[in-house]
Amino acid sequence: MPKLIALISKKSSISEEDFKIYYERNHAPLIESLFPTLNGYTRTYLFESNLLSDTLPLESDGAQSQFNVITELTFKNEEDLNKFFERGTSQDVIEAIRKDEAKLLAGEKTIMYRID
């Protein structure tokens, strides 16, 4: 099953709570509506309040991650993944995503990986 992960940063002007609320109520439904070949779309939030570096024996300086959410996108097969990428080249899709992301994301920091 093909998978992509995106490491995403919020705008510094948005609180963690407001970011999560907006992402769940607006951004995630938008992405799901634009990309019908998604088989799964999960988010894991990396907020400072959840940081455990002080309680675990890690070699870490305890600094907050530059990312605020890890998004995982899964697809049933390669064909669905390819349809996702094809759909992502549509000007309407690009504009809808950029308009929404401008409200909450520091888009220049987003990194995406294929992880299967």
Tell me the role of every PLM-derived stretch:
Residues 1-116:
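Macromolecular interaction modules
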